[in-house]
């Protein structure tokens, strides 16, 4: 969860904090966590495969995790993070509302889609990180750093320092993200729901 799950866990916590601040002036926080982890590339069936398409050299860390978060207002979030997924990094967020659905394709960002029957068509052109082949449908970012929000994050940090305010990705978000991930590991190890003290 720490290596791959911190981004989606942080994203859902950020959205609930923002919702709470807009509705009542205080963030909606995570109340409990249920989680599980696994090392799917270490199971015998995968180890027996002669050709391995998935990254499998990780040591002392899971390559699959899932966490169910329950928030103070009773809403839920299901977060999965994994390396055992062909086609590169996937960071997808779906919010199901009582009056709509919001689908966010953080990565792959689908603003640009390209196709080639053979990866050699693209030559040395960079497509995206952690993709095992350039063949088939691909989702390159016209400006990967901008599309992933790195300049915007830095701009907010500089503005926060200049204006004397907390950045959008501030200390409470960082603290709660780490707290939820740690609680997730405790849940996975002990096989139980972990309640967070508030």
Give residue spans per PLM region.
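Rossmann-like dinucleotide-binding domain that binds NAD(P)(H)
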Residues: 1-76, 81-88, 172
